[in-house]
UniProtKB/Swiss-Prot annotation:
Record GO biological process: glycerol metabolic process; lipid metabolic process
Protein name stated in the entry: Glycerophosphodiester phosphodiesterase GDPDL6
Tissue: Expressed in flowers and siliques.
Signal found in the keyword field: yes
Length: 753
């Protein structure tokens, strides 16, 4: 246990945001809030940091205190043992959150609770000594880490109060049930004299009325909790929807209400937001505060939020029309940063850091990649660099698309499946390739959002699945100039194959397009030329303003001097995989490499790719929050740019004052310390050691010279020189694809279990 506390304190000290002194807070300009009292909305941590550790465990409570904004509130769901001891657990049944069913496998019972028969292991059947000494906690949401299961004891209410959170909220869900079994939550509270309890909530009107005078003397706020609109409130036997019609009556026994978040922003069957209800306005008019519950980073919620949990909080606290007075969350640091750092953020604020926000096929998390809509949204979202991976049609038109194979990212399968072919130089599976179709044929199909997580059931913005138009390279460059973006990135793929086998000179086409756009004759906008082929980059050496970026598409663990010297001959920057900077195993960050430092010593910039918002793509160490991942790579690893499919998330972070760790402020978004979270788990639960990534071999940087563009017959199927030798960037394609498939299968098992 001592080891646990030492390691955990180190984890807190090194990797999470600790609130600073109130004096620093005074320097921050006051924000105008649309809450009932005009104050900042409260962050209420349900069971501490229950999104990571078992609910109300000492770890969950300590981490919530260490990562939340000053003045946050700790929420404990009160349950009572048969000898009257108060515990902090969300359910009256113990089997979903503890090991009780394995300790007493034959002790399942059935009780009637609020008119319904429930089966399980009920807390009222066990005394406190049994629960504290024989039962341990488990994570009750299966997509969350199970590595801490069975290691932490159930917390008594007094244990949580002993952590001295800034504020404490006690939720009493089952007063009527406990009273039936001769246990009184009201008497339990009186025994505590309400000390340290700032807020008490309950869905039972009778209970709130019974403690009203005591709570008033203790200056404890009472909150009435609404359940499902069709559920029945035990005291009045009225549906909650009926009680909602007379909010003014609630003011007689409570100062606020707690509602599921869809009472405020309902979501339709397609998972898009419906117009906001008038609930907050009506409650505020009645003099009631409004708290919204149900927030978590690892829930699939409205597509309007683009899998960015901060966007959801902002919808409730900074929509220009109203603000809730507080949010109940399993991930308090995300709520804290959303309210403290991102609310009332002027869209024109300058970035706090030097890192570039570079798109991956535009805003391809929201629209089909490389379409006009994806690029426009990326520009609107504040991206610095928009990107175009250049593909070629059979008749020589250069256009922007993620890959030469159109199968996954267009509707080509419905029309051109008979044109599918095998091109082992590009990929190990058959595909419908752009260079086998004319531009007119390509334009006859629709773009399609490419979803890297289809196997796990995740979707991306299905309402716009096929929206937008394909973008030619010329149109892309004109868009970049017209919108005055910081720069453009041109990614050149398969140049050797296209030249030798298809008679298409993609390098020459790109050079010509840049010349025609005059981007080769100015220094106002950046031009980045990216390729996994060093010979392609060398062909642009004669244009000094261009930044040449070598894409290294395999995991590396080190960058030896010989490899770096070879990179310097061809490139000014590298594009590296996330796992080349921070190693990950089973969704835990296990360590970090020195690759960024090694590249920077040689004056080589480092861009990291690809960042996505979906929580299944984000290590637990980042709190299932894309913002923490951004902070880890930008502030923690010092990268020079992030390549992302959701540029709005990256831009919001970089424009927030909380991203500047040199400022003295009340809250900062700090990077995670890779590997620290795993040390909290017991030794027996540790992950098996994984071998380090191999170092970058200089041979993998060197490519043969580009072959000349072959003169082929007009049908594009004859002629051409012999097969070219394999390029460095394609050496590991087959292996990487196999690993990707295995990883996808593993994710599917992990997140559908």
């Amino acid at each position: 246990m001592l080891r646990f506390f030492i390691l955990f304190s180190l984890f807190l000290h090194s990797s999470v945001a600790a609130p600073k002194t109130p004096a620093a807070a005074a320097a921050v300009p006051a924000k105008k809030w649309l809450t009932l009292n005009g104050q900042e909305p409260a962050v209420v941590a349900r069971g501490g940091f229950s999104g990571l550790f078992p609910e109300s465990s000492i770890s969950a409570n300590d981490l919530a205190i260490g990562t939340s904004s000053p003045g946050f509130t700790m929420l404990c769901n009160l349950q009572m043992t048969k000898d009257g001891v108060g515990l902090c657990l969300s359910d009256i049944r113990l089997d979903n959150a503890t090991t009780i069913s394995s300790v007493f496998p034959k002790a399942q019972k059935t009780y009637k609770v609020n008119g319904q028969d429930l089966k399980g292991w009920f807390v009222i059947d066990y005394d406190a000594d049994t629960i504290f000494n024989k039962v341990t906690l488990v994570q009750n949401i299966f997509s969350r880490p199970s590595i801490f299961d069975g290691q932490m004891s159930v917390s008594a209410v007094e244990d949580v109060l002993g952590t001295k959170p800034p504020k404490f909220w006690l939720s009493v869900q089952y007063d009527a049930f406990y009273m039936e079994h001769k246990l009184s939550p009201a008497e339990y509270l009186r025994s505590l004299r309400f000390r340290g309890i700032n807020v008490i909530s309950s869905p039972e009107i009778g209970f709130l009325k019974s403690i009203g005078m005591d709570a008033g003397r203790a200056k404890t706020k009472l909150i009435f909790e609404f359940k499902d609109p069709e559920a029945v409130e035990p005291t009045t036997n009225k549906k909650y929807s009926e009680i909602q019609q007379n909010l003014a009556a609630i003011k007689a026994f409570a100062s606020g209400v707690l509602v599921p978040k869809d009472y405020i922003w309902p979501i339709d069957s397609a998972k898009y937001l419906k117009p906001a209800t008038t609930f907050v306005a009506d409650a505020h008019k009645a003099g009631l505060e409004v708290y919204a519950s149900g927030f978590a980073n690892d829930l699939r919620t409205s597509f309007n939020y683009s899998y960015d949990p901060s966007a959801e909080y902002l919808q409730f606290v900074d929509n220009g029309q109203f603000s809730v007075d507080g949010v109940i969350t399993d991930f308090p640091p995300t709520a804290s940063q959303s309210i403290t750092c991102f609310s009332h953020q002027n869209g024109n604020l300058p970035k706090a850091g030097h890192a570039l926000v570079i798109t991956h096929n535009g805003a391809s998390g929201d629209y089909p990649g490389c379409t006009d809509l994806a690029y426009q949204k990326a520009i609107d979202d504040g991206a610095d660099i928009i990107d175009c991976s250049v593909q070629m049609s059979k008749d020589g038109i250069a256009f922007c698309h993620d890959a030469a194979d159109l199968s996954a990212s267009t509707t080509a399968r419905t029309t051109f499946m008979s044109r599918a072919t095998s091109v082992p130089e590009i990929q190990p599976t058959n595909g419908i390739f752009s260079f086998d179709l004319t531009w007119a044929e390509i334009q006859s199909v629709k773009p399609q959002i490419e979803n890297p997580f289809t196997a796990t059931g995740f979707q991306r913005n299905p309402a716009n699945k096929n929206a937008g138009k394909f973008t030619t390279l010329a149109d892309f460059l004109e868009l970049g100039k017209a919108k005055a973006v910081t720069g453009v990135l041109i990614n050149i793929q398969n140049a050797a194959y296209l030249a030798s086998k298809k008679g298409l000179g993609v390098v020459d086409v790109v050079k010509s397009a840049l010349t025609n756009s005059t981007l080769d004759k100015q220094s106002t906008q950046k031009v980045l030329i990216q390729s996994d082929d060093s010979s392609v980059l060398s062909s642009f050496e004669a244009v000094p303003p261009y930044t040449r970026v070598l894409s290294i598409d395999k995991e590396i663990g080190d960058a030896p001097k010989t490899s770096i010297e070879e990179i310097k001959k061809h490139a000014d920057a590298v594009n590296l995989l996330r796992t080349s900077l921070i190693t990950v195993s089973q969704s835990f960050a296990t360590g970090k490499t020195n690759v960024v430092e090694e590249m920077h010593k040689a004056n080589i910039s480092v861009y990291v790719s690809v960042l996505r918002n979906e929580y299944i793509a984000i290590a637990f160490d980042y709190f299932s929050d894309p913002t923490i991942e951004l902070a880890t790579f930008i502030a923690g690893r010092g990268v020079d740019g992030v390549i992302t499919e959701f540029p709005a998330t990256a831009t919001r972070y970089l424009r927030s004052p909380c991203s500047d760790l040199n400022k003295d402020q009340p809250y900062a978004i700090l990077p995670a310390d890779a590997g620290a979270l795993l040390t909290v788990a017991d030794k027996e639960a540790q992950l098996p050691a994984i071998p380090p990534n191999p170092p970058l071999d200089a041979k993998d940087v060197i490519d043969p010279p580009l072959p000349p563009v072959a003169k082929l017959a007009s049908n594009g199927t004859e002629g051409g020189p012999p097969q070219t030798p394999p390029r460095s960037g394609t050496v590991a394609i087959a292996a990487n694809l196999s690993l990707s498939l295995l990883a996808m299968m593993a994710l599917g098992l992990l997140y559908t279990a």
